[in-house]
Amino acid sequence: MDNQGTLALESDQVADFFELGFLVLPGFLPAELVGRLEPEVDRWVDSGLRDRSIAACLDPEPSGTPGLLEIELTAHGELAGYPPLLSIISRLVGPEFVFHHMHSNRQAPGAAGKEWHHDYEQGPLADRSKIMIHALHYLGGLDRTVGALAVLPGSHREVAGKRARAHLGTVELPGEVVIEELPAGSTVLLHSALFHARRPSPAGQRRERYMVDSSYCQCGVSWPPVKPYWRHLLARGRELGLDGGRWPELFAERHFTEYVRPS
């Protein structure tokens, strides 16, 4: 950490991110923040707020908005604009980047895995000129009781659709790296074009998996939003001051195209 409490990246960590497409930050989030995030995740899931948020994305009217956003939960809002995280992102993509979206979930013990995919939103397909980053925050860490994250180093340099490897399920692939042991509060930063998969936990002892992911896009191109209520999301980020007065582009609308409903 530097004298402002920000994790200072070494040059080789920056180089590894660009070469491999991911960066592992064990125990990155302080226990105090994790302790406030977990009950907010419980509320988000148990009250039906998560389901209503998903339903709002399926609303035929782009103006439809959910009653509450993840970033309106106090600790989630802090996480979206968490200064040490944004400082690291600025080291990777430069000083101007914009918040894209946040997802929060508590997965049941023994939940199924998720097939190989990537989450890069830029189009057309051949455009990889700017970087999108997904920050995967594992509140309870990772171990065999919650499954593992498998990543395919270097695959972020491919020009491929999100589901180009989905037919493979979660099978082991040559060259993959499996991240399966991380302490509570750990974060994995992914170049969003990196192929990755969620491996289910093996049979036996299992526990719930708490994860919040937030994504950020390098400025310089127009990014497609994934939520029809994206303007409302950005406006709330500005109103709540989640940029901390330091990142003026973090919730700026001008970096997005219009929302297009998936076909």
Q: Residue ranges of each PLM-predicted region?
A:
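A short beta-loop-beta micro-motif enriched in histidine and acidic residues
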Residues: 121-132, 175-176, 182, 207-208
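Short, structured patches in soluble enzyme cores that scaffold and shape functional sites
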Residues: 103, 118-120, 137-141, 151-153, ...
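Short, surface-exposed loop/helix-turn segments at secondary-structure junctions
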Residues: 116-119, 164-173, 203-206, 227-232
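Short, conserved beta-strand element in jelly-roll/cupin
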Residues: 126-144, 181, 215-219
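Non-heme Fe(II)-dependent double-stranded beta-helix
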Residues: 1-19, 26-125
